[in-house]
Amino acid sequence: MFLMWALRLVYVLVSNGYFVKQLFARASIIGVALLLSACATVPMASVEESNTAKQFRSPEKGNSGLYIYRDSFIGKALKKDLYIDDKFIGESAPDVFFYKTIKAGEHKISTESEFSNSDLNIKTESGKNYFIRQYTKFGVFVGGANLEQVSEEEGKKAISKLNMAVSH
């Protein structure tokens, strides 16, 4: 008797769409929570180190300053490896930047992408800072990444809003 009553109640609720609406609402809340918590994180430099790098001082003679930053909205859950001349400097995440002092001259900047690394070759001059933007893009299986050199003005503006990651 109780089983018949329970089955009838379930039938009425399902036919009115009550369970479907509740299930959809709960699934939506869980989905949004997962998306918000899926943002990638990496080891961060101290506030003092970050603020010092944001002063954009000219590097010593014979050296160049290299800022690599990521400010794109796409791919917030992705971390991408970064390399300078095939040497690993760290994993990027959204809203972070790296600063490295490098010898003036030709360099290959690389980022992990979907199937292989994406490279950007630059030639730097002594005493100058250079700004490279890493951006993520949609891929076939996972998001890819690429690099572009930007103007000093654009780079400084973007980096002023970001925090510095620890580099290796």
Curated annotation (Swiss-Prot):
InterPro entries, per the entry: DUF2846, UCP012335
One of the Pfam families matching this protein, by short name: DUF2846
Keyword field contains Transmembrane: yes
Keyword annotations of the record: Membrane, Transmembrane, Transmembrane helix
Compartment(s): Membrane
Membrane topology, from the record: Single-pass membrane protein
Disulfide bonding pattern of the chain: none
Cellular component terms per the entry's GO annotation: membrane
Main location: membrane
This protein's name: Uncharacterized protein HI_1456
Organism listed in the record: Haemophilus influenzae (strain ATCC 51907 / DSM 11121 / KW20 / Rd)
Phylogenetic lineage: Bacteria, Pseudomonadati, Pseudomonadota, Gammaproteobacteria, Pasteurellales
